[in-house]
Amino acid sequence: MRAILFGGGLALLVSLLGTRVAINQFTRLGYGQEIRDDGPTSHHTKRGTPTMGGVVIILATVVGYFGAKLITGDMPTASALLLLFLLVGTGLVGFVDDFIKISKQRSLGLRSKAKMIGLTVVALVFGILSLSSWLEDDRGQSPASRHISFIRDIGWITLPTVVVLLLIWLIIAATSNGVNLTDGLDGLATGASVMVFGAYMFVNIWQNNQWCGQTGLDQPNLCYEVRDPLDLAVVAAAITGACFGFLWWNASPAAIFMGDTGSLALGGALAGLAILTRTELLLIILGGLFVMETVSVMLQVATFKATKRLTGTGRRLFRIAPIHHHFEMLGWEQVTVVIRFWIITGICVAAGLGVFYAEWVAGI
């Protein structure tokens, strides 16, 4: 518990102070955000706001985690290092995307195909390592499993390695892009991430307290077959603290944006937590806001293509997608949209944690 508190607190402090430094440096270097022309006109005033603040979130998380390891004297675990690799790797893809936008002074960075290739490489490396036998512990358990998981592994569904790698890629790509789509209003994705990563911190703490590796329980419905749950909680706490510190400067009116560097990194780390904690399907509930944002874009594209094919004129389901911009176009103030979407996130997190705990209680 000391490592969790220290890691989260140190990450918060580094992020809070580091973001202020980043704002000054990025402003001096001219690392400003370019705004899409088809978005709400009110967003044009944000052009030039420093971006790539995700660099600070990533740095604060890494410092927070390893600082906690120094305090406790414990060695880093394979699961935590894999999660940090995913955070940094997906963040690097976002960094390249942001840098292209800044250097070319346009709202389009990496092309979709190039971005997906980058995410695919990171996801496959993560997947192969997390399933590899040489990272198994003395109980023969690898960081990731070959089962589909909800609250825990669904034991009767064992998948071939190729299928598992495909699912890992899908979860990482979908979650990264989901957080990326949500990051369109001041503080929206950051605040939502605080709640979801905070929820995963508590999930990991509970899994550690009921861990099959230390409780001696032989009932699979009362303990959790998860690798290194306490160390995953330290990383989740560090990310939560880093997002809290960044939110101080990212809240409306934002003094800095996280950019694709931050949104892809947070999405990748969130997917990694779901995979490593064996709660992939639970992520759909906990990260309900990110799912909603992604589905709104999918419905918008599908509706436009279908109506264009049928009538010759494409029609849109929403005024603009993702859906948070739709409500802006309806006349909602930006802060109103953000707070109400945070409320949605809070409801999703409460529902997800409730389902998680209820499943354990039902097994008693």
Swiss-Prot record:
Pathway participation: Cell wall biogenesis; peptidoglycan biosynthesis
GO molecular function: metal ion binding; phospho-N-acetylmuramoyl-pentapeptide-transferase activity; UDP-N-acetylmuramoyl-L-alanyl-D-glutamyl-meso-2,6-diaminopimelyl-D-alanyl-D-alanine:undecaprenyl-phosphate transferase activity
Catalytic activity: UDP-N-acetyl-alpha-D-muramoyl-L-alanyl-gamma-D-glutamyl-meso-2,6-diaminopimeloyl-D-alanyl-D-alanine + di-trans,octa-cis-undecaprenyl phosphate = di-trans,octa-cis-undecaprenyl diphospho-N-acetyl-alpha-D-muramoyl-L-alanyl-D-glutamyl-meso-2,6-diaminopimeloyl-D-alanyl-D-alanine + UMP
Gene Ontology biological-process entries: cell division; cell wall organization; peptidoglycan biosynthetic process; regulation of cell shape
The organism's place on the tree of life at top rank: Bacteria
Cofactor: Mg(2+)
Top EC class, one word: transferase
Membrane topology: Multi-pass membrane protein
Predominant location category: membrane
Entry keyword Transmembrane helix: yes
A Pfam cross-reference name: Glycos_transf_4
Transmembrane segments: 3-23, 51-71, 80-100, 116-136, 154-174, 185-205, 229-249, 256-276, 281-301, 341-361
Protein's cellular compartments: Cell membrane
Keywords recorded for this protein, A-Z: Cell cycle, Cell division, Cell membrane, Cell shape, Cell wall biogenesis/degradation, Magnesium, Membrane, Metal-binding, Peptidoglycan synthesis, Transferase, Transmembrane, Transmembrane helix
UniProt-listed Enzyme Commission number(s): 2.7.8.13
PANTHER family xref list: PHOSPHO-N-ACETYLMURAMOYL-PENTAPEPTIDE-TRANSFERASE, PHOSPHO-N-ACETYLMURAMOYL-PENTAPEPTIDE-TRANSFERASE HOMOLOG
Task performed by this protein: Catalyzes the initial step of the lipid cycle reactions in the biosynthesis of the cell wall peptidoglycan: transfers peptidoglycan precursor phospho-MurNAc-pentapeptide from UDP-MurNAc-pentapeptide onto the lipid carrier undecaprenyl phosphate, yielding undecaprenyl-pyrophosphoryl-MurNAc-pentapeptide, known as lipid I.
Family per record: Belongs to the glycosyltransferase 4 family. MraY subfamily.
This protein's name: Phospho-N-acetylmuramoyl-pentapeptide-transferase
Provenance organism: Nocardioides sp. (strain ATCC BAA-499 / JS614)
